[in-house]
UniProtKB/Swiss-Prot annotation:
GO terms for molecular function: magnesium ion binding; thiamine-phosphate diphosphorylase activity. Belongs to the thiamine-phosphate synthase family. Keywords: Magnesium, Metal-binding, Thiamine biosynthesis, Transferase. This is Thiamine-phosphate synthase. Pathway: Cofactor biosynthesis; thiamine diphosphate biosynthesis; thiamine phosphate from 4-amino-2-methyl-5-diphosphomethylpyrimidine and 4-methyl-5-(2-phosphoethyl)-thiazole: step 1/1. One of its GO terms (cellular component) is cytoplasm.
Length: 211
């Protein structure tokens, strides 16, 4: 039963681009995307604060669901829509502070054991990955594939879920067919020959999410 310890999110979050700059946040919001994540890696809080502030302001202007990856203190300070954390970040994060601030929480998982850990935290949504091989980041685990993804989605049938990892435009329909509520994409948009067209096509497949 979906009873998160954090504010809920729509069951279907739709197309969910993960990008590393405010410029991409603004472009994608302007293109009609309504769920997205700012993921800037390996910088100190003070180095990314201006970008976090700008991204949150854009998210508010477009009435979008903007998640901040990892920088949970800044997300709380500037009242982001939500925070996304990897498994390795859960132990080092003050989840009570995120909850008290009224922010949504998304958590990454890579197998059944990590899903158990995520469920214990009762987040707003659970990300399932990586579905396919990915060049975006180094992954210690093997790709799950569509069958494993479908099994996880079935297990979490009443929970908002996000598929991530190596999802291209060509693979997106098969991923959505598993019943997952959202697809997170990175290079499918940022490395596309025509990012506007790729975004429009992915929105056609995954939607903008439920209100």
């Amino acid at each position: 039963m979906y009873q998160p310890d954090f504010p809920p999110v729509p069951f279907r979050l739709g197309l969910y681009p993960v990008v590393d700059s405010v410029q991409w946040i603004e472009r994608l919001l302007d293109a009609g995307v309504r769920t997205l994540q700012l993921r800037i890696k390996d910088r100190r809080d003070e180095e990314v604060e201006a970008d976090v502030v700008a991204a949150i302001a854009l998210g508010r202007r477009y009435n979008a669901r903007l998640f901040i990856n990892d920088y949970w203190r800044l997300a709380i300070k500037h009242q982001a829509y939500g925070v996304h954390l990897g498994q390795e970040d859960l132990q080092a994060t003050d989840l009570n502070a995120i909850r008290a601030a009224g922010l949504r929480l998304g958590v990454s998982t890579h197998d059944d054991m990590e899903i158990d850990v995520a469920l214990a935290a009762r987040p707003s949504y659970i990300a399932l990955g990586h579905v396919f091989p990915t060049q975006t980041k180094q992954m210690p685990s093997a790709p799950q594939g569509l069958e494993q993804l479908a099994r996880h989605v079935e297990r979490l049938s009443d929970y908002p879920t996000v598929a991530i990892g190596g999802i291209s435009l060509a693979r997106a329909p098969a991923v959505i067919a598993t019943g997952v509520g959202s697809i997170a994409v990175v290079s499918a948009i940022t490395q596309a020959a025509d990012w506007r067209l790729a975004t429009a096509q992915l929105l056609e497949i995954a939607g903008v999410g439920d209100e």
